[in-house]
Regions:
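Glycine-/small-residue-enriched transmembrane alpha-helix faces in small-molecule transporters
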Residues: 1-37, 71, 78-79, 128, ...
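Cytoplasmic-side transmembrane-helix entry/capping segments in multi-pass membrane proteins
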Residues: 10-11, 62-72, 113-126, 145-146, ...
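Transmembrane alpha-helical segments that form core, pore/gating elements
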Residues: 14, 50, 103-105, 138-191, ...
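Transmembrane alpha-helical core positions of polytopic small-molecule transporters
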Residues: 17-21, 46, 69-77, 81, ...
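Specific alpha-helical transmembrane segments that line the substrate/conduction pathway
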Residues: 37-48, 81-114, 152, 230-249
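Hydrophobic transmembrane alpha-helices of multi-pass small-molecule transport proteins
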Residues: 50, 73, 115-135, 182-185, ...
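Specific transmembrane alpha-helical segments of multi-pass solute transporters/efflux pumps
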Residues: 51-96, 105, 125-128, 132, ...
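Helix-helix packing/entry segments at the starts of transmembrane helices
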Residues: 78, 92-99, 163-181, 210-249
Length: 254
């Protein structure tokens, strides 16, 4: 029964991660919103939805404020959005979670975790997928966008590693969103001349933040203490496939 609950939680988290790729691409592809405004609204709506966790843990809240975690979350969210302007859903997810896989496997090895044959295969597949996208002659995405998505993946890996500390998942995630939001807003204001949005862009941003990000990231922080870095990274390799399946399903129904 416990295993079934764990599998369900992991499945929900991975589906939400894939949904974020799809929602971000939908918002940016049609020019509904600029990436910095998308990131700011995504983080702000997530912070708002998660704020009750901070009140519930008011007595221990101070220890949950970890500025570096908030910074990593902001870097991931902003670069993820900016990169998706010129990347399709599948390629973006592959670059993101391929970088996550690489970084978290390296961290796990340094921490003494073992690399099984299955996990090694996952790492090889991730690196091969990135190489296939970036090698000369391949139908490669713009290098600048690809590099931004890779850095976003490294930031997400760092954010995930810090989540293994095992403190109250809801309050920790809420604090991270609150810390990340003003940093993203500052960037958005800095480039406000390039800013634009319509109703669809705002709706997709809020849906990404309040639903696909807030709840999923709490769930992910709940899972991380029981997962090794290598296992956590391997699980996330399912996200590019789920994202591409979501796009395919949407395309088949239009």
């Amino acid at each position: 029964m416990a295993n079934c609950a764990l599998i369900l939680k992991i499945s929900l988290a991975m589906l939400a991660f894939a949904a974020n790729s799809i929602l971000c691409r939908l918002a940016l592809q049609g020019g509904h919103i600029d990436p910095l405004s998308f990131s700011s609204l995504r983080l702000a709506s997530g912070a708002l939805v998660l704020s009750p966790f901070l009140f519930y843990h008011a007595k221990t809240t101070l220890s949950l404020w970890r500025p570096l975690s908030g910074f990593y979350l902001m870097v991931y969210a902003v670069l993820f959005s900016v990169a998706y302007i010129h990347l399709d859903t599948g390629a973006g997810a592959l670059l993101l979670f391929g970088a996550v896989q690489f970084a978290m496997v390296i961290h796990g090895l340094f921490k003494g975790e073992s690399l099984s044959v299955m996990r090694a295969c996952g790492l090889v597949i991730a690196l091969a997928g990135i190489a296939a996208l970036l090698l000369p002659g391949a139908k490669a995405p713009p290098l600048y966008s690809a590099l931004m998505m890779i850095v976003a993946g490294l930031a997400w890996a760092a954010y995930s590693v810090r989540g293994r500390a095992g403190q109250a998942a809801g309050a920790s995630t809420a604090a991270n969103f609150v810390l990340a939001t003003p940093m993203a807003l500052a960037l958005s204001l800095l480039f406000m001349k390039q800013g634009h949005y319509d109703a669809a862009g705002i709706a997709l941003s809020l849906l990404s933040g309040a639903a696909a990000s807030a709840g999923a990231y709490v769930l992910w922080y709940t899972l991380l203490p029981s997962l090794g870095s290598i296992t956590a990274s391997t699980l996330q390799l399912s996200v590019p496939c789920l994202a591409m399946l979501g796009v395919w399903y949407s395309w088949m129904n239009h």
